[in-house]
């Protein structure tokens, strides 16, 4: 690209391989620039890029680079590539705004999804002005999420070395949680969604608030009711649930073919009723919301929505036995929900838990390690694994897959030290 026109391509390749981040490599290797310390203001940069025809943008970017120092070039590459990200969750950013402004984080979240960037009305309110006058009837409601049950049962330092038997895990459950306080249901292998319908319109949201309705017109067309339902988006295969791979073929599409609509019909397995008509039910206990949901479905019989059944159990041993069959039943595991819990956005501790099936394991050999990208660019964090098999000349290693996630920062540091040793 641009940098390879200014520096030796092989030098750029080697530098990128060492640094691991494209923006950082370009910002550091670009020759000269920014000598007078007068980088162009952001508004001028945006105006220049907007005004430039597509065929001339490379020249405009190069001219901007020449006026910038390494820090400004780094920011510009990140902005242009859409990669200006930091390791901060949206929830944490909203929590910080709440602490700074004194406004409730729950209200900030609700207004957030009813407004559009750059959120001028929201920031005026946070600075002491009037609350934005916005219709939230069709807006996304921040979802309630669950903690892994292991995170609750074990201290953080114990989790990595946790090799307890199922009986020992049940004993911990019994010591910390009363089964009578919880309802259980299957954790379905789909996509968590929120379906909202009012006189104003209809919307289908992902767990992060993204509007995925255009990919599922069959669902939107069937939402002839008013309210807000929380559930799992699934694809039907006759009377059964199709594998997740079938649902993936319908995700992230702006248009859907008639063939997909016919062969991969979508439906929602409902977990919770957040609004019944205009009535907000989120402050009610889960047991009461669940009863309202069951009655709502029985009365209205909404097309493409069914009820996620409760899993009856009389103790942790019985529930552990059910969980052991989750893989054969094509389930991800179980969900545990306190019967007295209100619906609270975010991930409050102690109210909802997910008890996923145990992962399968395989004995593999680490054969390659590669530097990562971004914040992991200084670590060997991308690993290739192989298994032994019988070859023409005896046993041989055959690569079977790569992994670059699923480990903690401490484990990453340990693996990096092992690779470098």
Predicted regions and their residues:
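Flexible, glycine/threonine-enriched loop-and-boundary segments that flank and lead into catalytic domains
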Residues: 147-182, 316-322, 336-373
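Short glycine/proline-enriched turns and hinge-like loops at secondary-structure junctions
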Residues: 196-198, 345-348, 376-381
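Conserved, well-structured core segments
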Residues: 269, 333-336, 368, 382-384
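Short, contiguous acidic/charged loop-to-helix segments that flank catalytic cores in large enzymes
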Residues: 371-376, 400-410
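C-terminal structured "cap/appendage" subdomains that terminate the fold
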Residues: 418-421
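Short glycine-rich loop/turn motifs
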Residues: 181, 191-193, 331, 350-352, ...
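Metal-assisted phosphate- and nucleotidyl-transfer catalytic regions
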Residues: 295-344
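N-terminal nucleic-acid-engaging modules of covalent nucleotidyltransferase systems
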Residues: 1-273, 277-312, 384-386, 390-399, ...
